[in-house]
Amino acid sequence: MAPFHLTPQTLVGRRFGPDTFDGIRIALMGFCPPPAAFGRYPRDRTRDQHFIHLAPESVRIVTHGGLPVLSLSHVYGGPVASATVEELAWYGIEHVLAYGLAGGLGVGAATGETLGMGAFYLVQDALARDGTTPHYSEASVIPADPGLVEQVRVAWTGPDPILPVRAATNDAIYRESDAMLDRFRAGGCHVVNLDSAHLYAASLVNSAGRRLRTVQCGVVSDVVERDGSLLSALAEMLAKGATGVNPLDKTGEIVRFYIETLSRRLIDKIP
């Protein structure tokens, strides 16, 4: 890779060294507000600007069973995701466990099951369009870490199955047309979000030269059918009128799985 003018070492690294988080090797990355499930765990707030795009109140150290993990929330879009992953690599993080929301495309999951409102999904790989990903990779499809994908499949503890998907990574939430979604379906995609390809690409190629093991799981918050009809729990939730599925609350099941099960398996090197 050609040298670049700024790196985490020359920017945040002027104040914070690689050992800043004292040996923590796992980071949770929330592409949404933190769900209420975090209230189950002791959390220490950080006080400094360790990440250029994240406010200190969005960065916590969460502990369960004596195991601390770094928790980042309100990470949105490609530029923020990629910069944050670059900085995590500088800080010595080895595993990134991401969670968030996505729109369903009205098709079954990769294994054929219905992928409806409130379904849990596991992003096996992501279709890149433009935006941030091409700065890191020329590939059109960017994979998650295959070992982590398998770990999620084997160890998932949620109340409903978690379904494997390909995520289309868009860059403008208010510019998603029927024609665009049809192209995503033709590309083998099951959901659309704003982050998966960027997240995975920066995990594979970054200024630290480190390959972070990264996976993203989430909850379907709205569905656009092939005929263009829209069902959106997210819109109802934002209007403070949700009466059925609350997708943000359901991300708490993913957070619990990451903190209580997957993190321990990774540290204990359980296959």
Residue spans of the language-model regions?
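Metabolite-binding pocket within alpha/beta catalytic cores that recognizes anionic/polar moieties
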Residues: 1-150
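Glycine-rich beta-alpha junction loops
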Residues: 32, 103, 168-173, 198, ...
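Hydrophobic/aromatic beta-strand patches that form the interior of the parallel beta-sheet core
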Residues: 70, 97, 121, 165, ...
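A short alpha/beta connector and helix-capping loop motif
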Residues: 109-126, 205-221, 231
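Active-site rim beta-loop-alpha module in soluble metabolic enzymes
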Residues: 140-191, 196-198
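Generic non-transmembrane alpha-helical segments
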Residues: 151-159, 202, 257-269
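A C-terminal functional module that forms or caps the active site or interfaces directly
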Residues: 179-226
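His/Asp/Glu-rich mid-to-C-terminal helical/loop segments that flank catalytic regions of hydrolases
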Residues: 224-271
